[in-house]
């Protein structure tokens, strides 16, 4: 699933703008302008980094990811040997730290299923979840600079004896503080009807402004048009 979206040389992993942008749009259905090839403040999708970690280290019963820096096309990340605490770095600067606990599964079917389900869920939260959620408190993102940034995410399984867990979204939360806010997007993992795990994605929002329905309608229309215009072949 990830071949073609990164390159590795001398033990370091990097991403071109085209690779990162194609992953965002093709795999995650994520049209955040930060992932556009020509973005001035370009960054590699956090979901691509998450996927790379699972692809290399497997799935642990408990995993917590903290995104500490924006990775662009100039960054070459070092992936260390597998430990309970992992840091993806360049020149001692940490871009992503991962804490792992419990047993670890290297089952490829589980890993690929989890990557696919999580990335699809994660990429589709804007605008269809985030905008209505913020609207409940009469605020919205700034359409001129829609700054929605990945802060952290976590997953937890009661056991790893499963190959294709199904991810189900549960009630999101939004904490407003002035012109900034934090969005929490929780979910559960199921095997049939049985809940076997849980997790959450945490995002930071800045430049928050007063809610305007007309502007929201225009923003959603603009976003939907971007999906048509920018969908990779």
Place the predicted regions along the sequence by residue.
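Glycine-centered secondary-structure boundary/capping sites
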Residues: 36, 76, 138-140
């Amino acid at each position: 699933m990830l071949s073609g979206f990164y390159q590795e040389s001398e033990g370091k992993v990097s991403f071109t703008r085209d690779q990162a942008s194609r992953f965002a749009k093709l795999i995650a259905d994520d049209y955040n302008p930060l992932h556009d090839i020509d973005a001035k403040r370009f960054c590699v999708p956090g979901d691509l980094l998450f996927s790379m970690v699972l692809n290399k280290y497997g799935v642990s019963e408990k995993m917590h990811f903290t995104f500490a820096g924006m990775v662009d096309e100039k960054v070459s990340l070092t992936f260390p040997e597998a430990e309970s605490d992992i840091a993806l770095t360049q020149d001692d600067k940490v871009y992503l730290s991962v804490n792992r606990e419990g047993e670890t599964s290297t089952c490829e079917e589980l890993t690929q299923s989890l990557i696919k389900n999580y990335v699809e869920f994660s990429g589709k939260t804007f605008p269809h979840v985030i905008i209505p959620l913020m609207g409940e408190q009469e605020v919205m993102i700034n359409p001129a600079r829609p700054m929605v940034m990945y802060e952290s995410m976590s997953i937890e399984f009661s056991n790893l004896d499963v190959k294709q867990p199904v991810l189900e979204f549960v009630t999101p939360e939004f904490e407003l503080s002035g012109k900034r806010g934090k969005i929490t997007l929780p979910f559960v993992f199921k095997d049939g009807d049985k809940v076997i795990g849980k997790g959450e994605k945490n995002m930071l929002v800045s430049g928050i402004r007063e809610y305007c329905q007309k502007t929201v309608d225009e923003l959603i229309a603009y976003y939907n048009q971007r999906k048509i215009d920018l969908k990779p072949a």
